[in-house]
């Protein structure tokens, strides 16, 4: 009888465990993307300015345009002044009633003194939303000791993918804390969700972004500030090699619009429903299945990248 009760208890626990995870998966997919209406971002932000890094291309540029469309003044930060000037012009052509400022900064520069100068400029305005988007990618997947560009490239990826989100958050948070309102969105990557061979540094730095965001959320839980980590999969951007758009690979405008709608409804999410479906499926797969798929994808990616760099046709 005791054995029978034990077996029944174990069986019930297993069923409850499976049911819990099934419900969690369904909620992760449907709540932010189907059930909930977008929140009033201006009310939650508590201020009219949005700062976006890496704002002249891809996801960052689309975040800038979408925030401007929603009535925020935008402060765009990137490396190239000519691209910043053009982006400012393009935003104002579509949204002439807002204000756009820009600051040039090369985020491979880890100088604290230079960061303080940048933060001094940013703190001239009341920042309600900070989008830490700037990031860097290797040319192609490779083993750590064979990475193209050596330790210089490795250092740059680590610096760009970790320092800006950390230091800019630290520098902007004081004004958010004093207002008891604000939103900080850190853009990570699908690569931070699982351990990726031959993308070790990129994957690890994106995991840092996700982990940092979660820690800050706990740290400032009583200050009225929203912290969100976005972990997108493939988006049709220059950084991703400009792939064709599809259900699973949206353009950056579609992605940014979707991701902004999840603020206040999901603390950690991919930002796009198709990516969330991919993410939930991926988490269910055993490592050997993921590793085999990644290995095949890496080989194809590397072959294409090397062929392009050498300007030779693929075999």
Swiss-Prot record:
Stored Gene3D superfamilies: NAD(P)-binding Rossmann-like Domain (3.40.50.720)
InterPro entries tied to this protein: NAD(P)-bd_dom_sf, Sc_DH/Rdtase_CS, SDR_fam
Enzyme nomenclature, EC number: 1.1.1.-
Tree of life domain: Eukaryota
GO molecular function: oxidoreductase activity
Binding residues for NADP(+): 47-76
Keyword Lipid biosynthesis in record: yes
GO biological-process terms attached to the record: fatty acid elongation; steroid biosynthetic process
Database matches in CDD domains: 17beta-HSD1_like_SDR_c (cd05356)
Catalytic-site annotation from UniProt: 202
GO CC annotations on file: endoplasmic reticulum
Keywords of this entry: Lipid biosynthesis, Lipid metabolism, NADP, Oxidoreductase, Steroid biosynthesis
Annotated Pfam families: adh_short (PF00106)
Family membership: Belongs to the short-chain dehydrogenases/reductases (SDR) family. 17-beta-HSD 3 subfamily.
Name used for this protein in its record: Putative steroid dehydrogenase 2
Organism ancestry: Eukaryota, Metazoa, Ecdysozoa, Nematoda, Chromadorea
């Amino acid at each position: 009888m005791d054995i029978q009760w034990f077996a029944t208890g174990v069986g019930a626990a297993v069923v409850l465990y499976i049911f819990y995870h099934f419900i969690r998966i369904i909620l992760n997919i449907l709540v932010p993307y189907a059930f909930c209406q977008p929140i009033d971002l201006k009310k939650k932000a508590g201020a009219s300015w949005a700062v976006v890094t890496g704002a002249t291309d891809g996801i960052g540029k689309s975040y800038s345009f979408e925030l401007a469309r929603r009535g925020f003044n935008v402060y765009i930060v990137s490396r190239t002044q000519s691209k910043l000037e053009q982006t400012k012009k393009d935003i104002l052509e579509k949204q002439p009633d807002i204000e756009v400022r820009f600051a040039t900064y090369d985020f491979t520069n880890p100088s604290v003194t230079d960061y303080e100068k940048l933060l001094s400029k940013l703190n001239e305005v009341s920042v309600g939303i900070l989008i830490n988007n700037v990031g860097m990618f290797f040319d192609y997947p490779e083993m750590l000791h064979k990475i193209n560009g050596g330790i210089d490239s490795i250092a740059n990826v680590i610096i760009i993918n970790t320092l800006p989100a950390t230091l800019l958050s630290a520098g902007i948070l004081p004004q958010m804390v004093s207002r008891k309102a604000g939103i900080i969105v850190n853009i990570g990557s699908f690569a931070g969700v699982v351990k990726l061979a031959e993308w070790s540094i990129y994957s690890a730095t994106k995991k840092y972004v996700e982990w940092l965001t979660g820690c800050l959320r706990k740290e400032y839980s009583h200050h009225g500030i929203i912290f969100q980590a976005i972990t997108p999969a493939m988006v049709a951007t220059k950084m991703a090699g400009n792939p064709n758009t599809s259900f699973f690979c949206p353009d950056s405008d579609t992605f940014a619009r979707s991701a902004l709608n999840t603020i206040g409804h999901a603390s950690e999410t991919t930002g796009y429903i198709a990516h969330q479906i991919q993410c939930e499926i991926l988490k269910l797969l055993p490592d050997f299945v993921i590793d085999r798929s990644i290995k095949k994808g890496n080989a194809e990616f590397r072959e294409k990248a090397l062929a392009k760099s050498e300007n030779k046709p693929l075999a």
